């Protein structure tokens, strides 16, 4: 749609019964959208001058006068046009400042000459030289002026909100009128077609009548011919008088024939007259019908023209509504900028006051005045920064401001400045508190504190607990306050934990498990633990004696021989006991995670701790299946389509991360640490990998699997699982003990090529066999209705595919992932996921405990500086590399930092790689022990690193509203996702359900508070207008499969449906309707399915009341389902006449459901096609 010009200023709209004033940016007003209201007031007309079109195409500057008025009660039709005023070339240009308190007369009476230049920057303002010099001399606004700016921006936001709501309502009304006109046009054309059908029938009857007339004429001619023949025959008989008797008989016969011919002639004449009369009537009727057709044609054409004009009006008002919402978003940004500027000024002022108080006891009065000058300069700097961030609205040079600026210019601050600053600080506190209270009133149940949501997040994978929708948060507490509060609540457990920790340190220092310690390399690590423990304090020495006392107590018990079976059982009991004790304990610690509990339990009962577990090797072999079941579960929650949409990050970001990180670490290891080339290659590739099990578990616990950084992290981890195969193949080839004599390019190429072929054959076979066999096999087993056999078949599929990939040289986890990916496409995925949940949880916990068993705390104490330095370099270096690589792939800085923190720790495959390197003679056992320790500690730090990433995001990402705007690069990997328009209570529940099933979605809302809450929970929620084509394009609407629309107002819902159906018709839209009439209009606008919001809440309340009335649960469910089915059937029947499908957008094979039996629900008696949107 072309616009004549974008006027870069604000205009005043004045209308309504109460003459309320509305501020609107003049870029919303174009020569094509020109206002002409009632009573001579001009409003928009869809026609536009061709000269103005060419002007906008050539991007020429057009000047307009500044006065426009809008009647708030216009009836939805636009007429007339706004002619551009004669351009006035004036050397000056400035921004016209429009406040909600201004009037139209003020704007009209403004006799200044304005010139507005159209350009890329909407906020570019030019001043004359005098004004520019004056502005440079003026100092920044004071705190009071900043508060005034904030108040003005808040008022402007309120006006913009009312304005956008008004335009959305008008857009809805105009659209409804357009729909009615369209229906009238369609009805008129139907009447025309029906009349034409009647005319055609009349024409057919006319042709039949003409044929009858022709037949009657022919019959009359035949009768006359017979009469003539009879007369001639009679005359001929009269001349022949041979026999009188014969003549008499012949004459008699001839007379009879003559009479018969006369009768036929008479009958034919009557028939002919009747046919001619009928033909005349049909011709008259045809003429009348033709006139009726002409009249209906004219009426239909008029209705069609009116409908087309109405559609143009709808397009125009939709553009105006979109621009009104855009202005509201800009006003929100200005309010946010004003708040930030005010907070900066207050922070600077409070800091300066504290500094003055501290220095006041030493400095004299002169120094105090100098300190005040420094404070003033800081405030001026902050004010200049705020001025650059703000679009200054209504800054007028009043007397107070001028006096303040003159004081600053002369460098003579008053002696009472400190007192005034203190008063201003107190006022600013009250303003901020009042502002926070207003925001909390706007969102009473939705904007609960971030701290509360984060605490509940640790308890469950559901990121929206029930308290989120009912609690009123008192504000976001700091991290320190949350730690103190948690410590007060959990102080007995903390004391117990520190006691156990001290006992463990004492045990390690006392040399428990000395026989299991690996030999140390003198030139790399320090083998003496005495240097560490010689300086211990008396309390620690007393704690070191605890293990000996515990051993003495144990020796007092009678000793019995333990056979192999009992030893295995005891190992299982110790593992379960340790997990039961440590996991709940670490979950209570702030920032704790079950992973940390498992790791701590493994350290304590492992070979480097109390040495309780005897068969460590067998335990590790079993624990590997924990990772197998985890990857199988991840595959169940994904799909082939979603995986294909992530190929950019899997093969792009993943390969870049592995190659770059391995190269950097390998070079540092070779040139800085002096390791050999093969060892540097193994160390670089081993440390480049991350822990799939730990990271995915942490993401699921925190509910971040579907977030931006969660998707990117999973993609990199998936590629790392493939890269492990290459590393394990490479280690024997570069070994000095290899039969081929070390590194050989040909040998490596041959091995990798053979491995690639085997992997491709194995993966292809698994995918092909799974698609052909899994569904029939599971159907056959499900028909037996045996849960044990069903679970056994699931275990067979998991272990079988894992074995196949292991035999092909791939990891077992990759095979399980493929099996889960194939089962996700069947209808048995939910049952399969439920069956494997117990195995997955226990085996995954066992895996984390085996990782803890690999950590040697005594070796850590002996080589603490070396290990901590290596650990710090690993975490910081990998994070920096991932941030750089992620930025190149379009990931934002904050998301890239969070991905880097999650991928920075080492992985479980490093244990395998380093162990194999020791066996091949590439690295020494001492070095591998140190690397085991570094990798194990880094894995233990993963939950805290994830929490640190969230803290960074909450501190930096949510400061500015602009950071909440959608960016196309952040959603370009989404395919077939869901768009949630409106992140209120309904949108949040939908987001929770989708996130729990790992279904990708993107949410939009115009409330920055709601968006900030969603972003703090790592959800893909963006600040934007759901009815804007540009915003919808940025969130990938052209690739989305459906949209759930639950905005606050009916007008906003209607505008969003209209935009999606017009610009993105492939997206199925499911909308919340306020009532049936609203739902019908939404369906006419293009909604796929409409859900009346009154039905389901009524049914829920009715169910609660019936339960209170002591009705059985089964009877309540039957009654509710019966009513729902009957209501939807009646609603569908009522909508059949209008051609809509209101009633959740699905059809039934039966018009009315059968009454359900006691043993059956109503859902068993009807076949439903489609998805029930409730």
Curated annotation (Swiss-Prot):
Mutant lacking the gene: phenotype: No visible phenotype. Disrupted K(+)/H(+) efflux antiporter in the kea1 kea2 double mutant. Double mutants kea1 kea2 display strong growth retardation along with pale green leaves associated with a delayed formation of chloroplast pigments and electron transport complexes, as well as maturation defects of the plastid ribosomal RNAs and hampered RNA-protein interactions. The double mutant kea1 kea2 exhibits a drastic photosystem II (PSII) quantum yield recovery under moderate salt stress. Impaired rapid hyperosmotic-induced Ca(2+) responses in kea1 kea2.
Residue range covered by the transit peptide: 1-57
UniProt topology in membrane: Multi-pass membrane protein
Regions of this protein lying in the Stromal compartment: 58-565, 614-620, 670-678, 735-746, 829-841, 887-898, 950-1174
GO CC annotation: chloroplast inner membrane
Biased composition regions of type Basic and acidic residues, renumbered to the chain: 420-448
Activity regulation note: Repressed by sodium ions Na(+).
Tissue and organ expression note: Detected in leaves, stems and flowers. Expressed in shoots and roots. Mainly localized to leaf veins, hypocotyls, mesophylls and guard cells. Accumulates at high levels in small and dividing plastids (at protein level).
Ranges that cross the membrane: 566-586, 593-613, 621-641, 649-669, 679-699, 714-734, 747-767, 808-828, 842-862, 866-886, 899-919, 929-949
Localization terms from the record: Plastid, Chloroplast inner membrane; Plastid inner membrane
Pfam families: Na_H_Exchanger, TrkA_N
Catalytic activity of the protein: K(+)(in) + H(+)(out) = K(+)(out) + H(+)(in)
InterPro entries in UniProt: Cation/H_exchanger_TM, K/H_exchanger, Na+/solute_symporter_sf, NAD(P)-bd_dom_sf, RCK_N
Annotated RCK N-terminal domain residues: 975-1092
Modified residues (N6-acetyllysine): 170
Keywords from the UniProt entry: Abscisic acid signaling pathway, Acetylation, Antiport, Chloroplast, Coiled coil, Ion transport, Membrane, Plastid, Plastid inner membrane, Potassium, Potassium transport, Transit peptide, Transmembrane, Transmembrane helix, Transport
Chloroplast intermembrane side: 587-592, 642-648, 700-713, 768-807, 863-865, 920-928
Region entry Disordered, spans: 119-141, 420-457, 1141-1174
Post-translational modification: Acetylated at Lys-170 by the stromal acetyltransferase enzyme NSI.
PANTHER family (alphabetical): K(+) EFFLUX ANTIPORTER 1, CHLOROPLASTIC-RELATED, K(+) EFFLUX ANTIPORTER 3, CHLOROPLASTIC
Miscellaneous notes: The full-length protein being inactive in a heterologous system, the N-terminal region (58-556) seems to have a regulatory or auto-inhibitory function.
Name by which UniProt lists this protein: K(+) efflux antiporter 2, chloroplastic
Species classification: Eukaryota, Viridiplantae, Streptophyta, Embryophyta, Tracheophyta
């Amino acid at each position: 749609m072309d616009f004549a010009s974008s006027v870069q200023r604000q205009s005043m709209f004045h209308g309504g019964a109460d003459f309320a004033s509305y501020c609107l940016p003049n870029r919303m007003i174009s020569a094509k959208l020109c206002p002409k209201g009632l009573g001579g007031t001009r409003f928009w007309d869809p026609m536009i001058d061709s000269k103005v079109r060419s002007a906008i195409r050539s991007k020429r500057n057009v000047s307009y006068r500044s006065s426009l008025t809008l009647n708030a009660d216009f009836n939805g039709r636009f007429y007339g046009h706004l002619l551009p005023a004669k351009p006035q070339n004036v050397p000056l240009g400035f921004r016209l400042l429009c406040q909600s308190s201004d009037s139209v007369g003020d704007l009209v009476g403004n006799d200044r000459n304005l010139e507005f230049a159209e350009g890329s920057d909407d906020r570019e303002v030019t001043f004359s030289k005098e004004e520019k010099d004056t502005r440079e001399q003026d100092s920044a606004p004071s705190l009071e002026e900043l508060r005034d700016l904030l108040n003005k921006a808040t008022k402007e936001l309120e006006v913009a909100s009312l304005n956008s709501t008004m335009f959305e309502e008008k857009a809805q009304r105009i659209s409804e009128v357009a729909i009615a006109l369209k229906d009238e046009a369609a009805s008129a054309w139907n009447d025309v077609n029906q009349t034409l059908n009647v005319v055609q029938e009349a024409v057919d009857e006319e042709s039949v009548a003409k044929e009858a007339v022709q037949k009657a004429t022919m019959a009359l001619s035949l009768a006359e011919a017979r009469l003539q023949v009879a007369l001639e025959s009679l005359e001929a008989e009269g001349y022949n008088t041979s026999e009188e008797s014969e003549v008499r008989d012949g004459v008699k016969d001839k007379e009879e024939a003559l009479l018969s011919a006369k009768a036929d002639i008479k009958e034919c004449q009557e028939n002919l007259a009747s046919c001619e009369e009928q033909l005349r009537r049909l011709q008259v009727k045809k003429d009348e019908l033709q006139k009726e057709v002409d009249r209906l044609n004219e009426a239909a054409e008029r209705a069609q023209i009116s409908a087309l004009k109405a559609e143009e009006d709808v397009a125009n008002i939709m553009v105006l509504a979109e621009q009104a919402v855009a202005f509201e978003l800009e006003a929100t940004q200005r309010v946010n900028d004003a708040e930030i500027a005010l907070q900066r000024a207050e922070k600077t002022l409070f800091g300066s006051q504290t500094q003055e108080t501290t220095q006041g006891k030493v400095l004299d009065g002169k120094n105090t005045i100098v300190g005040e000058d420094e404070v003033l300069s800081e405030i001026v700097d902050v004010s200049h920064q705020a001025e650059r961030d703000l679009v200054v609205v209504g800054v007028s040079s009043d007397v107070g401001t001028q006096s303040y600026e003159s004081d600053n210019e002369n460098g003579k601050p008053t002696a009472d400045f400190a007192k005034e600053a203190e008063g201003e600080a107190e006022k600013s506190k009250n303003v901020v508190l009042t502002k926070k209270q207003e925001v909390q009133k706007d969102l009473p149940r939705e904007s609960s504190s971030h701290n509360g949501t984060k605490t509940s997040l640790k308890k469950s994978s559901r990121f929206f607990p029930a308290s989120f929708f009912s609690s009123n948060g008192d504000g976001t507490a700091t991290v320190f306050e949350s730690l103190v509060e948690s410590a007060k609540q959990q102080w007995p457990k903390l004391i117990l934990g520190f006691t156990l920790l001290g006992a463990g340190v004492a045990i390690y220092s006392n040399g428990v498990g000395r026989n299991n310690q690996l030999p140390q390399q003198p030139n790399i690590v320090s083998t003496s633990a005495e240097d560490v423990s010689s300086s211990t304090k008396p309390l620690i020495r007393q704690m070191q004696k605890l293990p000996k006392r515990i051993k003495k107590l144990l020796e007092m018990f009678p000793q019995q021989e333990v056979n192999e079976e009992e030893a295995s059982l005891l190992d299982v009991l110790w593992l379960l006991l340790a997990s039961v004790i440590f996991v709940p304990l670490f979950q209570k610690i702030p920032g704790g995670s079950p992973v940390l509990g498992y790791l701590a339990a493994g350290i304590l009962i492992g070979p480097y701790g109390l040495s309780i577990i005897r068969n460590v090797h067998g335990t590790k072999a079993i624990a590997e299946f924990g990772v197998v079941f985890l990857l199988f579960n991840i595959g169940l929650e994904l799909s082939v389509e979603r995986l294909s949409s992530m190929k950019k990050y899997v093969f792009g970001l993943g390969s870049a991360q592995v190659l770059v990180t391995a190269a950097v670490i390998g070079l540092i290891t070779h040139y800085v640490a002096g390791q050999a080339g093969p060892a540097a290659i193994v160390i670089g590739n081993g440390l480049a990998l991350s822990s799939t099990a730990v990271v995915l578990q942490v993401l699921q616990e925190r509910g971040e699997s579907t977030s931006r950084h969660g998707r990117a992290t999973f993609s990199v981890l998936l590629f790392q699982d493939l890269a492990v195969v290459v590393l394990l193949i490479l280690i024997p080839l570069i070994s000095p003990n290899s039969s081929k004599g070390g590194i050989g390019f040909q040998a490596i190429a041959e091995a990798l090529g053979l491995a690639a072929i085997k992997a491709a054959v194995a993966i292809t076979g698994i995918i092909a066999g799974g698609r052909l066999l899994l569904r029939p096999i599971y159907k056959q087993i499900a028909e037996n209705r045996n849960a044990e056999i069903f679970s056994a078949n699931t275990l067979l599929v998991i272990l079988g595919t894992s074995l196949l990939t292991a035999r092909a040289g791939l990891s077992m986890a990759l095979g399980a992932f493929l099996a889960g990916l194939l089962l996700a496409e069947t209808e048995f995925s939910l049952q399969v996921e439920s069956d494997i949940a117990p195995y997955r949880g226990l085996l995954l916990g066992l895996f984390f405990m085996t990782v803890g068993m690999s950590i040697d705390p005594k070796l850590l104490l002996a080589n603490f500086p070396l290990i901590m330095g290596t650990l710090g370099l690993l975490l910081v270096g990998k994070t920096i590399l991932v941030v750089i690589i992620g930025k190149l792939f379009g990931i934002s800085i904050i998301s890239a930092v969070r991905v880097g923190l999650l991928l920075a720790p080492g992985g479980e495959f490093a244990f395998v790689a380093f162990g194999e390197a020791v066996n091949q003679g590439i690295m020494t056992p001492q070095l591998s022990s140190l690397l085991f320790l570094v990798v194990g500690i880094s894995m233990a730090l993963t939950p805290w690193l994830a929490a640190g990433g969230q803290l960074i995001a909450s501190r930096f990402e949510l400061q500015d509203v602009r950071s909440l705007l959608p960016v196309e690069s952040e959603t370009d990997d989404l395919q077939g996702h869901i768009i949630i328009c409106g992140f209120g209570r309904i949108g949040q529940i939908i987001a929770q359900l989708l996130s729990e099933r790992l279904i990708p979605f993107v949410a939009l809302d115009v409330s920055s508070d709601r968006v900030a809450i969603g972003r703090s929970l790592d959800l893909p929620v963006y600040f934007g207008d759901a009815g804007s084509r540009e915003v919808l394009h940025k969130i990938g609407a052209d690739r989305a499969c459906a949209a759930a629309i639950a905005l606050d107002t009916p007008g906003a819902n209607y505008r969003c449906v209209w935009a999606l159906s017009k610009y993105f018709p492939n997206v199925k839209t499911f909308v919340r309707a306020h009532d049936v009439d609203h739902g019908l209009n939404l369906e006419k606008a293009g909604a796929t399915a409409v859900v009346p919001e009154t039905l389901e809440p009524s049914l829920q309340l009715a169910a609660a009341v019936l339960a209170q009335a002591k009705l059985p649960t089964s009877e309540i469910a039957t009654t509710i389902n019966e009513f729902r089915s009957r209501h939807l059937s009646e609603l569908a029947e009522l909508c059949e006449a209008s051609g809509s499908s209101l009633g959740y957008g699905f059809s039934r094979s039966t018009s009315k459901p059968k009454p359900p039996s006691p043993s059956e629900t109503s859902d068993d008696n009807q076949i439903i096609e489609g998805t029930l949107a409730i």
